[in-house]
């Protein structure tokens, strides 16, 4: 998934307890510092219809060209997923 300054490389997985999660890395392809990136994960059925939503946060800060791991619990597994960045905090990097 590419959303301008962010790129997401994620997939469905299972938590240690066996529950479905969507996990991966979010990349800050922009030039400034960002922190606490909020994500919306939409669970889709085989026809592309949204059958569930979950929100999570990639906690911590990232400089430009950095990445951060995230893991968002899902209500149920789906055929595919759509991921969107909802919001983020910015900070000065002194560059």
Name every feature range the model reports, one short phrase each.
Residues 33-36, 51:
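Short acidic/proline- and small/hydrophobic-mixed sequence motifs that coincide with surface turns
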Residues 48-55:
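Surface-exposed loop/edge segments in extracytoplasmic proteins
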Residues 55, 71-95:
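Terminal connector regions
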Residues 59-66:
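Short proline/glycine- and polar residue-rich coil/turn motifs
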Residues 26-31:
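Asparagine-centered strand-capping/turn motif at beta-strand->loop junctions
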Residues 1-19:
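Transition segment at domain starts
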Residues 38-42:
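Beta-strand signatures of extracellular beta-sandwich domains
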């Amino acid at each position: 998934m590419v959303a301008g300054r962010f790129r997401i490389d994620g997939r469905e997985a299972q938590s240690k307890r066996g529950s479905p999660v969507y996990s991966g890395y979010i990349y800050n392809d922009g030039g400034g510092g960002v922190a606490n990136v909020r994500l919306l994960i939409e669970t889709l059925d085989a026809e592309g219809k949204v059958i569930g939503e979950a929100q999570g946060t990639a906690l911590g800060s990232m400089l430009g060209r950095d990445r951060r791991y995230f893991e968002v619990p899902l209500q149920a597994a789906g055929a595919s997923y759509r991921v969107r960045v909802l919001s983020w905090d910015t900070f000065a990097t002194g560059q």
